[in-house]
């Protein structure tokens, strides 16, 4: 038997492992039923003074059966762009709630269902397995960017949760009962890291990663997901509106640090894919697939002419940017309530 490594050496290996896989932090991407992951329920966000709610989302309390005091209930589903903010009131959903209370009274409530790195399929699963039973008046789905950029950096399979390849590797590493002793890897951080990166390399080869065909498959899977959401919306019990989120590639003039948000190669890819997604939204509307309980809006250019430095990376924005988004969502709520009343 090999001598056991000293504790300090083992700790060094763990630190290296966690450093290499910091984007899989279980505190912000904790396993969740149906949706792959959300925040770790009731845990405090790192270096922040707020906690996730009992479901792993950024609310002061998670929604339950709707009380009579809630005269308006709005759900905002999305990714980490909804998590940004010093306190709930500083997030996009929190700022939206403030605006809706001014328009509709104290009974207006907005709930934040932003999960860091969530893609559209995960958002659909959340709506159909949890949210549709909670009597919302309006559901917003703010997304698009994660479906585009995460296959570039993480799991290359279009429409998959970004860390699925790592989950597959972990499951096979620990729970594959068919492996014989001579086939099993030594239980170590080094072997696990090699297994995960090896699977990623294999998947990239199998999917023709970063090829033209692969780019179009990313768009195709996103379009299929949107169409599924459209078909499901009739049974959700509340109008659903998909909003294509803003991206730095749609800003005409990038100010200060905005100019260094990402590499030129990646920004060119993001620009191509956003153009294609915009065309997808146009086709849905032209084909009559975005009407009634399911509608779509393109908010990607909401900051196009803004001369302020608003983006902190390719999709996250400053507090000023979050306020612009919240104001726009308040207008969207007003429009959806009118359409719902007419319908």
State the predicted function of each range.
Residues 73-77, 111, 139:
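Conserved beta-strand elements of the Class I
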Residues 222, 310-343:
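Histidine-centered active-site loop/cap adjacent to the catalytic His
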């Amino acid at each position: 038997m090999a001598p056991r490594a000293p504790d300090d050496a083992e700790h060094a290996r763990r630190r290296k492992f966690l450093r290499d896989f910091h984007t899989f932090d279980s505190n912000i991407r904790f396993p969740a039923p149906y949706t792959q992951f959300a925040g770790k329920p009731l845990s405090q966000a790192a270096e922040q003074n707020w906690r996730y709610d009992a479901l792993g989302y950024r609310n002061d309390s998670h929604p339950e059966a709707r009380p009579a005091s809630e005269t308006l209930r709005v759900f905002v589903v999305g990714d980490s762009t909804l998590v940004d903010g010093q306190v709930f009131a500083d997030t996009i959903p929190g700022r939206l709630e403030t605006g809706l209370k001014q328009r509709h009274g104290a009974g207006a409530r907005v709930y934040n269902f932003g999960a860091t790195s969530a893609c559209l399929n995960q958002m659909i699963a959340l709506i159909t397995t949890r949210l549709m039973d909670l009597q919302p008046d309006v559901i917003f789905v703010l997304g698009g960017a994660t479906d585009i950029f995460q296959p570039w950096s993480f799991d290359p399979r279009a429409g998959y949760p970004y860390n699925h390849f790592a989950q597959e590797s972990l499951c096979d590493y620990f729970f594959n009962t068919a492996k014989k002793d001579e086939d099993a890897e030594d239980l170590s951080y080094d072997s696990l890291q090699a297994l995960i990166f090896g699977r990623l390399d294999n998947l990239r080869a199998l999917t023709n990663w970063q090829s033209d065909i692969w780019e179009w498959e990313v768009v195709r899977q996103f379009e299929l997901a949107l169409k599924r959401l459209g078909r499901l919306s009739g049974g959700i019990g509340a109008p659903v509106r998909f909003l294509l989120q803003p991206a730095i590639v749609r800003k005409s003039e990038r100010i200060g640090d905005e100019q260094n948000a990402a590499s030129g190669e990646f920004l060119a890819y993001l620009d191509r894919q956003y153009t294609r997604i915009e065309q997808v939204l146009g086709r849905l509307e032209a084909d009559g697939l975005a009407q009634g309980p399911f509608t779509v809006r393109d908010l990607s250019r909401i900051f196009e002419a803004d001369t302020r430095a608003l983006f902190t990376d390719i999709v996250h924005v400053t507090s000023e940017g979050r306020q612009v988004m919240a104001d726009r969502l308040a207008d969207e709520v007003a429009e959806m309530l009118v359409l719902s009343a007419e319908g």
